[in-house]
């Protein structure tokens, strides 16, 4: 459910950030970078139960160029980047009260024909990896084929970047 009051949304999302073991120690500057553009672009979902927030997800629709920028530095996105293309990236996925499954089902239903990528961070090692997600109506084999093309386009572009820091083998699943 999207709530139409931006300050109320910010309060709900900040509550979820503070309740998340991964997010609670992140600086306020990351909250501003990750949350404000999502609310402005209406690229978020906030699940509530009994008027209390239980899960939040935001996504950016990136161009290939901004996707590379994001992979190189996850704090680099500016407001305009969030609506720069058609390559969907989950920016935040927060479900600190056990509602991860509900959020997953909601997103697969909301975006039945869409593909998403995400950087998932291991809470113990703080190492990130790129993960793939697809809507509920997309055939898994077709999704894999499209993701393979996405990765090919990405790797081709990254090879031309001399200042890129992300480890390419992670994109290939090695």
Curated annotation (Swiss-Prot):
GO MF: ACP-dependent peptidyl-lysine N6-myristoyltransferase activity; metal ion binding
Main EC class the enzyme belongs to: transferase
Major location category of this protein: cytoplasm
Gene Ontology annotations for the cellular component aspect, listed alphabetically: cytoplasm
EC number of this enzyme: 2.3.1.-
Pfam family, one: HlyC
Inhibition and activation profile: The acyltransferase activity is inhibited by heme.
UniProt cross-references to InterPro entries, sorted A to Z: RTX_toxin-activating_protC_bac
GO BP annotations listed: killing of cells of another organism; toxin metabolic process
Catalytic residues, chain numbering: 23, 92
Disulfide bridges in this chain: none
Residues the record lists as binding heme: 151
Keyword vocabulary terms for this entry: Acyltransferase, Cytolysis, Cytoplasm, Heme, Hemolysis, Iron, Metal-binding, Transferase, Virulence
Domain of life: Bacteria
Catalytic activity: tetradecanoyl-[ACP] + L-lysyl-[protein] = N(6)-tetradecanoyl-L-lysyl-[protein] + holo-[ACP] + H(+)
Record PTM: Proteolytically cleaved by the protease systems ClpAP, ClpXP and FtsH, leading to its degradation.
Record's subcellular location: Cytoplasm
Purpose of the protein: Protein-lysine myristoyltransferase that catalyzes myristoylation of the protoxin (HlyA) at two internal lysine residues, thereby converting it to the active toxin.
Family: Belongs to the RTX toxin acyltransferase family.
Assembly and binders: Monomer.
The name this protein goes by in its record: Protein-lysine myristoyltransferase HlyC
Organism: Escherichia coli
This protein's encoding gene: hlyC
């Amino acid at each position: 459910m999207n709530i139409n009051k931006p300050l109320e949304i910010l309060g709900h999302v900040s509550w979820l950030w503070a309740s998340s073991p991964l997010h609670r120690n992140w600086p306020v500057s990351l909250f501003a970078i990750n949350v404000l553009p999502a609310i402005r672009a209406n690229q978020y979902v906030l699940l509530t139960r009994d008027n209390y927030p239980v899960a939040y997800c935001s996504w950016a629709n990136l161009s290939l160029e901004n996707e590379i920028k994001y992979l190189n530095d996850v704090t680099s996105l500016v407001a305009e980047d969030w609506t720069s293309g058609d390559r969907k990236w989950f920016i935040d996925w927060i479900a600190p009260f056990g509602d991860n499954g509900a959020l997953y089902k909601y997103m697969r239903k909301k975006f039945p024909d869409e593909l998403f990528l995400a950087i998932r961070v291991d809470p113990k090692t703080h190492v990130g990896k790129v993960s793939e997600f697809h809507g509920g109506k997309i055939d898994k084999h077709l999704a894999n084929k499209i993701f393979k093309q996405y990765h090919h386009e990405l790797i081709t572009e990254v090879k031309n970047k001399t200042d890129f820091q992300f480890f390419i083998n992670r994109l290939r699943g090695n």
